[in-house]
Structures are given as C-alpha cells and as structure tokens.
Amino acid sequence: MSTEKINLLDFDRKGLRELFAQELGEKAFRADQVMKWIYHFGVDDFDNMTNINKQLREKLKQKCEIVAPVVSEAQHSSDGTIKWAMRVGDQDVETVYIPEEDRATLCVSSQVGCALECKFCSTAQQGFNRNLKVSEIIGQVWRAAREVGLEKETGRRPITNVVMMGMGEPLLNMKNLIPALEIMLDDLGFGLSKRRVTVSTSGVVSGLDQMTGKIDVALAISLHAPNDKLRSEIMPINDRWDIQDFLASVRRYIASSNANRGKVTVEYVLLDHVNDGTEHAHELAQLMKDTPCKINLIPFNPYPGSPYKKPSNSRIDRFQKTLMQYEHTVTIRKTRGDDIDAACGQLVGDVIDRTKRTAMLKAAKGETIEVKAL
C-alpha cells in the first residue's frame, strides 16, 4: 500500500471537495475552510488551521500535505524585479516577480523546457522534459506570495496579476493548467480577476479550442511573424496550425470571453532584419484587421549563441508608427530585470535532457544558454 501523501495544492475547489468526501469522509465546507487557510493565509501546517477540529487535523496530517516548490535561488534587479529559481522535483523552473506603480505581475512557468523549437527561444534549445503538476504551477504563485509577504511586511506590492508566460507552452499542459487557473480565480484561492490572469500561447489550436467556453481569462498570442513562410521558419508549430487556423481559433475564444473585452493581445518579438521591416509592419496590420487586438512589440533580448540581434531604436520606432497608421493600439514592452537575466527571453531553467543545450553551449564557447519567458 502506498504511503505517499496527497498534496492538497493539486486540487481546485471541486477536486478538493471530492477528496474530502471520498478520502476523509468530510463535508464540503471543511474543504473550503482548508482551501482558505492555504491560499488566503499561506498556511502549510495543519496545526495552524485554528478553526479545524483536532480530529480532522490529525486525519489531514496522516493522509495529506501542502507542498509548494521551494526557492533554490533568488536574484534581485535594481528595478525591483525578482527572479526565483524554484525547485520542482530534481529540477528548477523560474518565476519572475515584476512590480510596477499600480500592480505587481508574476510570470509563471507551465513546463520544464519546451517542445515547440521556436528559433529565437533558448528554452526550446534546451528541449522538453515534462509538464508541471497543478501543485507546481499554482505552487509558484503560493511560494511567491509568501516571499513577497502576504501582509506587506516586506514593503513589496502584493501580486495582482499572473501571466502564464514562463518556461513552456501552457496549452500543451491543459490537464494541469485548467485547475491551476481555477485556483487563481477562485475566491477561496487567490481571488484574482479574470482580466488579471493571462495565458499566452504560441498557437496550439486544439488547446485553445478546449479552453473556449471552459475557462475565461485574458489571452495573449505569440505571433512573431506576419506570414506563414516566415513564421514557419522561426516557429515550426506553424506547420501544424498556420496563421489563419490560429487566428480563427483566437476569434472563437474572444467571442466567448468577457475577460478579453473583445480583444486579444498580440505578442511580436522584433528580430533585427528578420521580421522588423516596414513591409512586415504593413503586412501585420493587414493580417490583424479582422481580429480585434492590441499589439505588444518586444525588442529581442539576446542570449549567448543566439543567431538574432535586437533591432535599433529607429527600426523599432518605425515599425510601431507604421502599425499605428492603421489605427492599431501598439505598445513597446519595457525591458524589466535584464540585469539579472529575467527579461523576456532571458530566463534560465534546469532541464535534465540537455542534448540540444549542450550543442548550443559548445557553439557559444561555454557561455550559459538562457531561457525566455514567452
């Protein structure tokens, strides 16, 4: 008989209620009480749950546990950004806390590595190892909330937004993504507004269609090219689902969504003399004319061994102004945490299968390969 304890972080409210009924013989309200202790107060010791009777606390200690990823390393940027390496099993993923004047955003990983092989992404060069469990996804948020300080004792702004833009493709981990999102939104969980939780995808149409009508959060799409030829060159997933398939799926999702207010966020990494020409801007503007959107331009953050460069400021400015001629809303993402390699394109993970990474390391003459946040 297995003696492994059940990690309560692996369950959303529905799952936790079922667990309490089937494994503990307890009513739903007891599950709700425990869930509130875990997420509202950051408690991971059953003995500290003071409104739970002793008999139930003993049953919980015998059969269950509350185990989140632990911080194995923390780096602090001069701009307030914090990058945590979080230990999941025998590997690390990275989670980034980004404070601003009116919010604090947490960038969360969904996989160890990534299988999509986007050419500008060093996560892809490391290869794919495994999906994160529910407890390892929501546990990043739980741990970060503890680190930041639930009662503001650290002076840091509490987490107000979560973006699934860390290591991995979220929609290739739907089984564990959905319950984690449910906990983020649940009033007994983190109670975040659906407009403050964002899922980013590189174009996994099957996953996006699965989300449609099932869970409502903000959507960001990693587009990065205005035509299929160029997109297939830098993002091989385009050979499975081309741009028109992708955008049709996006329109289906936002039509059923309140969180997106009828618009999708388009992420577009600018690669010097690859996808950043005026002709690309015109093509992108035409491409998106039937899909209500706001376009977020991301100047490429180089990593050692990368074949791409960041465009000049003049090219970035020209690209933005060209798009704005078509009355698109266009922003340029401000680089945050680049001094600790926590900017978009610079997160460093720990992946066991390093076949691709080893080759990249040799090509970079021994320099560390870095990992992006989508």
From Swiss-Prot:
Residues 100-339 form the Radical SAM core domain. The active site is at 94 (proton acceptor), 344 (s-methylcysteine intermediate). Binds 1 [4Fe-4S] cluster. The cluster is coordinated with 3 cysteines and an exchangeable S-adenosyl-L-methionine. Signal peptide: none annotated. S-adenosyl-L-methionine binds at residues 168-169, 200, 222-224, 301. Disulfide bonds join 107-344. It is an enzyme of class 2 (transferase). Pfam families: Radical_SAM, RlmN_N. One of its GO terms (cellular component) is cytoplasm. It comes from the Bacteria. Its EC number is 2.1.1.192. Reaction proceeds by a ping-pong mechanism involving intermediate methylation of a conserved cysteine residue. Belongs to the radical SAM superfamily. RlmN family. Specifically methylates position 2 of adenine 2503 in 23S rRNA and position 2 of adenine 37 in tRNAs. m2A2503 modification seems to play a crucial role in the proofreading step occurring at the peptidyl transferase center and thus would serve to optimize ribosomal fidelity. This is Dual-specificity RNA methyltransferase RlmN. It comes from Vibrio vulnificus (strain YJ016). The gene is rlmN.
